[in-house]
Curated annotation (Swiss-Prot):
Keyword Transport: no
Biochemical pathway: Purine metabolism; IMP biosynthesis via de novo pathway; 5-amino-1-(5-phospho-D-ribosyl)imidazole from N(2)-formyl-N(1)-(5-phospho-D-ribosyl)glycinamide: step 2/2
GO biological process: 'de novo' IMP biosynthetic process; adenine biosynthetic process
Signal peptide (residue range): none
GO CC terms in record: cytosol
The protein, known as: Phosphoribosylformylglycinamidine cyclo-ligase
EC number annotated for this UniProt entry: 6.3.3.1
Length: 346
């Protein structure tokens, strides 16, 4: 072999300098999420975090999630600013259903070719989501993997750890006949059902940037960041006895509400009691999607469902609306041995 060419990692498609530039870009926004329990700074081999001293019997709660094919739509439309918020929301909203306070968050960002501006936009969104939920962004991994992803396409995953007092874990065991169900409104499809969203766009030959809905581009509705409920729900838990919380994600109403119901109970909902944001009506019509499929795929305007005693329902409703949530009484718990765990009356 006579060729004396000296190959570098950059020749192979991995730009270490770009990775370092990204770290420099995000240091400031990451620092703003710091909690007093966090020890050390960004860049260590492992992140250290103490448990808050207020807990007598602290139980750690963990979760991981992604953003699904909402990423594909964001990449196609070159809108990346809300994706980081979505990522945090999917994790911390899962944690808070057990009554847990999120402590820290880590992210994984993988791409074929690192675009510093895009990655910085996503991670800035992650930091914003952490600020909204009160957890610290303590670290992450940026993986530039040529040949694994097409060009600047990327994927993200999030990992969150929270803590709850052992005696205050919310697990659905208190749910009983007569409990009232309160819904907290969603900001849109959140981060679920986007394979169907994209199919509807293609099926109806719709350009989400030029199609208007309620005076703004359809893309604004579809890429609205997932609402983060953590602080308002933690405040509610301190003031009323919450029996169960369901986060409406993949599987919609039919699969998520039963996850927190005891045996021999049934959730009976009144469809007219809450508002469907316009984007759901548009999708149902444009894709000729059945009512059953809408409720199985999307949150249809409901991000969280909270079960509590009828005596606490009015107070909880007032607290949530005063805190800035859109909240409605949407149903009740009934005793039932039916396999149909959720009934939605039109």
């Amino acid at each position: 072999m006579t060729d004396k060419t000296s190959l570098s990692y950059k020749d192979a498609g991995v730009d270490i300098d770009a990775g370092n530039a990204l770290v420099d870009r995000i240091k400031g926004v990451v620092k703003k999420t710091r909690r007093p329990e966090v020890m050390g700074g960004l860049g260590g081999f492992g992140a250290l975090c103490a448990l808050p001293q207020k807990y007598r019997e602290p139980i750690l709660v963990s979760g991981t999630d992604g953003v699904g094919t909402k990423l594909r739509l964001a990449m196609d439309l070159k809108r990346h600013d809300a994706i980081g918020i979505d990522l945090v929301a999917m994790c911390v909203n899962d944690l808070v259903v057990s009554g847990a306070e999120p402590l820290f968050f880590l992210d994984y960002y993988a791409t074929g070719k690192l675009d510093v501006d895009t990655a910085a936009s996503v991670i800035t969104g992650i930091a914003e989501g952490c600020s909204q939920s009160g957890c610290a962004l303590v670290g992450g991994e940026t993986a530039e993997m040529p040949g694994m992803y097409h060009g600047e396409d990327y994927d993200v995953a999030g990992f969150c750890v929270g803590v709850v007092e052992k005696s205050e874990i919310i697990d659905g065991s208190k749910v009983a006949e007569g409990d009232v169900l309160i819904a907290l409104g969603s900001s849109g499809p959140h981060s679920n059902g986007y394979s169907l969203v994209r199919k509807i766009l293609a099926f109806s030959n719709t350009d989400p940037e030029t199609t208007q809905l309620e005076g703004k581009p359809l893309a604004d509705h579809l890429l609205a960041p997932t609402r983060i409920y953590v602080k308002n729900i933690l405040s509610l838990i301190e003031q009323v006895d919450v029996h169960a919380i369901a986060h409406l994600t993949g599987g919609g109403f039919w699969e998520n509400i039963p996850r927190v119901l005891p045996d021999n109970t049934q959730a009976v909902l009144d469809e007219s009691s809450w508002e469907w944001p316009a984007v759901f009506g548009w999708m149902q019509q444009a894709g000729n999607v059945s009512r059953f499929e809408m409720y199985r795929t999307f949150n249809c305007g409901v991000g969280m469902v909270i079960a509590l005693s009828a005596a606490d329902a009015d107070k909880a409703l007032r607290l949530m609306n005063d805190a800035g949530e859109k909240a409605w009484k949407i149903g009740v718990i009934k005793a039932s041995d039916s396999e149909e765990r959720v009934v939605i009356n039109a």
